[in-house]
Amino acid sequence: MENSNCDAKAHISAVIFDLDGTLLSTEQVTRDILKDFLAKYGKVPDKEKEKKRLGMANKEAAISIVNDYELPLTPEQFTLEIMPMYYGLWKQAKALPGVNRLMGHLRKHGVPFALASNSIRKNIDAKISHHEGWKENFTAILGSDQVKSGKPSPDMFLEAANRMSVDPDHCLVIEDSLIGVKAGKAAGMKVVAVPSLQIETHLYSIADSILHSLVEFQPQLWGLPQFRDWVDNTLPIEPIRIEGIFSNGLLLEYEDDGWSALPDQVWGLYIGWAKIDRQKVLKAVISIGWDLNCCISKRKIQAFTVDESNESIHDSKMQLLLVGYLRRSCYAGNMLNNLEILEEDKLAVRAFLNLPAFSYNTLNTFLQGDAVEDSLLP
């Protein structure tokens, strides 16, 4: 949903990324840490309170948490106690959809890009150290402890522009939090919001563009070189795995204590492989989005097997391996439309998945080296 004020006349010359929730799924892999920490003090996390802390600098977040939960600690003591719990999990954080593609594209075309995060610099370095080539490819890296004030102050973005020798009005900021979006606008920069909480997208109207995922990003709208990496009307993506129970065309995803294993930024119409009850493997089209109806917001995953009717599949265990992106999902108001598979979609699925690089056997061989347990493998 690339929208609103995209303007190629802006002549964007550099890009500034946020880190947590924008480039990396750190917020997802560490979401249980606060719950475990608060349990020691007889407290339970409040989701509404945690939403307001999205994007906060470490110091401000610590003060806010201690006050909100009335902890018998100073903010400094809280930080000293909780931070070691994070260190071991950062290595599990994965690049979010479209991130490696975009950074590689910018590097290939000589467009400088920087990293500006409300984390302190030491923690930034620890997080990105698990991703080969990342640190070396940023023209500048800034943490909240390297400027006078963290976001929503514009200080960090202005300093990043200065270090890249680019005027602020020629910089494009990519952010997942409202705090970060406000900082980018205060710096006089164009801002693309990719909300890490998709149910909150209505709050991001000050951004110049709002996307569900960086897979949707179109650099040519900002005067940057266009992507040319689609194959047979499909965009190859890093494999994404989903497991659950399939019935009546819908996949009920297995969740951990009410949390999805998927980042909110996995959104759109995908193609891939569906494995039924650990036996039959079929080509499939998968629609992923959110129903934002009234007070209930939930992810909706629809799957359509291409060469066999869905009607024969009821209450079965299904494992999906997404390997290609087709387009955005369709909405009517706040409701995700039922999946309608066009004949051209079927042709795209067959053509793409028949390519040797995306055959199921080839992907099995590739994924056998993955450190994450892969129940998709035979």
Give the residues covered by each predicted segment.
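Short helix-capping segments at alpha-helix termini
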Residues: 40-43, 69-73, 132-137, 165-166
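Phosphate/ribose-recognition catalytic cores of enzymes acting on nucleotide-derived substrates
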Residues: 238-378
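Helix-loop "lid/cap" segments that line or gate small-molecule binding pockets
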Residues: 37-38, 57-72, 127, 161, ...
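Active-site neighborhood of HAD-like aspartate-dependent phosphohydrolases
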Residues: 2-51
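Short coil/turn motifs that cap or connect alpha-helices
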Residues: 44-45, 57, 167, 190
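Substrate-recognition element of Asp-dependent hydrolases with the DxDx(T/V) motif
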Residues: 22, 34, 81, 99-129, ...
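Asp-based, Mg2+/Mn2+-dependent phosphohydrolase catalytic module
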Residues: 1-12, 104, 120-237
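Metal-dependent phosphoesterase signature
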Residues: 64-101, 109
